[in-house]
Amino acid sequence: MADVVIIDLGKTNSRAILADLTTRQEIAVRRMENRVLPGLPYPHLDVDGQAAFILGALAEFAAIMPLSGVMVIGHGATVALVDHDGLVLPVLDYEFSGPDALAADYDRLRPDFAVTGSPRMPGGLNIGAQLHWLRDRFPDQIARARHALFWPQYWTWRLTGQAVSEISYATSHGDLWSLAGAEIVQVTGGLFPPLAPAHAVAGVLRADLAAAHGLLAGLPVHVGAHDSSLALVPHAGRGARLPAVAMSTGTWLTAFAIGVEVMPPDPAPGVMASLDIFGRLVPNFRFMAGKARADILAARLDLPAHPAEGCRIAQDPKTGAFRLIDDTGAEVRPGGNDPAAGLDRLLAQQAIAGLRAIAAQGPIHVTGPFAGNRDFIAALQQGWPFPVRPRSYEASLVDQVASLFDEGQG
């Protein structure tokens, strides 16, 4: 296959990329800033806006050249509940704190870290917690649901009518999947459809959508994958030199210790284990580096140019906003003319601490916005004893998808 549309649904921004997978080159790119819609029944994702963006991009790209396929990748911790006709409830924003109201209840039900590799996380960051809260608050709507679909697979279903699940998403801090038992755990209520490989064709574009948007009937739509997990593929396939680290950045910084197929001993903050797109165990570490950076800079807080020992980033449990403090509780004072550089170095230090917590080794392959952040990359290079290799986002994403198809067909 050659000319494929990659739909990349990040938490903050979405991208549509027309790519030639043979040459691994991008041909055209569209971008959109995502919105969370406030109000009833709870903060939720702008599904209609994203649908217009996706279908508009497909129509625009089809006018450039014939398309041979579509693949959707998406951010984690997001699930859509559907019946035959569409959503039975809006798609909950995982930063919404509502599920915390039932935290004690849910904690008695959720599987242990040793079973799922999922640490307990706030708000809706564990999909199991989302489902528990939704089932309690909206029992009638949940009773109507036919499928629970992970975020990329919701769009695959919307484009094709075919319901599938994908392993890298199912095992990503959701409290959903028994790593040893290789099965969905009971807390989910049996709504998830069967697994299919990320590269497989789930179905073809619905005839009504093709006709409405001037697209060819029969356009293949692939199963799709979790965005961070896709970043592993070029560095974990046949002939790869291991161990290595795949670091995907954006709203979240996610780092995978490739070649270290050992469960972390305990759920330290940000530490977890999941399965990669091909079902192999990968310890990983993540924190909201992009959100923390945006929150702290937007708040115009006092930032040191050279963070002192003990200076750290903390998240307000009530608002979810990040701030910079030190462990003594003292106010952090300005320390130079470039406070953002100091913050970037601190974020890099936190990333390195996470890598050590999951016993990572080898070169770091950095993708996403932080790959172009010189201060962040310089701090990684200073603190990590192996090479650090940043790569531009669109180019790396095309390479990831091309590598996925190469591996899947091998």
Predicted regions, residues:
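Short, glycine/acidic-enriched loop or turn micro-motifs at the edges of active sites
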Residues: 11, 23, 99, 230, ...
